[in-house]
Amino acid sequence: HMSKAEYTDYLIRSIQAKGNEHALEVAAGTCICGRAVAPYVKDITCLDLTEAMLEQVKKLAKQEGIQNISFVSGNAECLPFEDETFDLVITRLSLHHFVEPEKPFREMQRVLKKGGKLVIWDMVATTEELRETNDAIETMRDNSHTRILSREEFEALFEDAFELQLEETTLVPVNLQSWMDLTSTP
């Protein structure tokens, strides 16, 4: 299991922020990535559809003393921002919640400045059998789960839109009980 500190440290190293970036985390939940990169960028906007999540992240950001953070209630499939607004767009464990993941992907592409960085951190199915198993488990623990995308589906999303600079797939072993406990699954 990869700890929060391990993946946020990895994210910070990967984005190579210069300190002047306007950043956005889409479908942010408690904006784990956004809060982690906040010290390294000019500002971070956390967007989520769920007001309860935004209230949680506001409290967390205040506790952590993060000043350069803002919160927006909005739909990832129709982002409430002008074209080419952000230098860095991040989404973590979100695309598997969308029936049509290309919609939020296109929106993230639209609001990203030319030459900007898009970071997608999500589960990837390496085989159809693994996808079916993972989807069954994810659906039990999270009823908003739709399906895990395959590597080929991710590649198709990026194919025409971006120059891929870093692609990394890491096998992260997860204890089933601790994974289910995250959402209080019986």
Role assignments for model-derived ranges:
Residues M2-E21:
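Conserved alpha-helix/loop element of class I SAM-dependent methyltransferases that forms part
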Residues L24-V26, T30-C78:
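Class I SAM-dependent methyltransferase SAM/SAH-binding core
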Residues E77-L88:
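A short acidic, Gly/Pro-enriched loop at the edge of an enzyme's catalytic core
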Residues V119-D142:
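Conserved class I S-adenosyl-L-methionine
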Residues Q165-P186:
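C-terminal helical/coil "lid" or tail adjacent to the Rossmann-like core of SAM-dependent
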